[in-house]
Amino acid sequence: MSEKTVERGRRKVRIGYVVSDKMNKTIVVELEDRVKHPLYGKIIRTTSKVKAHDENEIAGVGDRVQLMETRPLSATKRWRLVEVLEKAK
């Protein structure tokens, strides 16, 4: 018998900064997106905050982290921590 492997969709990967780590195994990360205004051409910075799963609780406030999209882990968590890219100073 041969096992069939199901191809999964590509997961989104984002880089952002931790703004809160007060919850158990959860961090709040601020993601920044830069969009060019369609008419005037000015680059506009928009930010969004997402909750991410941090199983080992290694990330702290101010850390630069990499997140990956995952299945819904709770009512508001849809991201998980991949790695801490840079610790806060």
Curated annotation (Swiss-Prot):
What InterPro entries does its record include? NA-bd_OB-fold, Ribosomal_uS17, Ribosomal_uS17_bact/chlr, Ribosomal_uS17_CS
Give the highest taxon in the source lineage: Bacteria
Per UniProt, the keywords (alphabetical) are: Ribonucleoprotein, Ribosomal protein, RNA-binding, rRNA-binding
GO MF entries:
rRNA binding; structural constituent of ribosome
Q: What Pfam families does the annotation carry?
A: Ribosomal_S17 (PF00366)
* One GO biological process term: translation
A Gene Ontology cellular component where this protein is annotated is: cytosolic small ribosomal subunit
Q: Relate the protein's function as given in its record.
A: One of the primary rRNA binding proteins, it binds specifically to the 5'-end of 16S ribosomal RNA.
Q: How does this protein assemble?
A: Part of the 30S ribosomal subunit.
Q: Which family does the entry's similarity section mention?
A: Belongs to the universal ribosomal protein uS17 family.
PANTHER family, A to Z: 40S RIBOSOMAL PROTEIN S11 FAMILY MEMBER (PTHR10744), SMALL RIBOSOMAL SUBUNIT PROTEIN US17M (PTHR10744:SF1)
The entry's protein name is: Small ribosomal subunit protein uS17
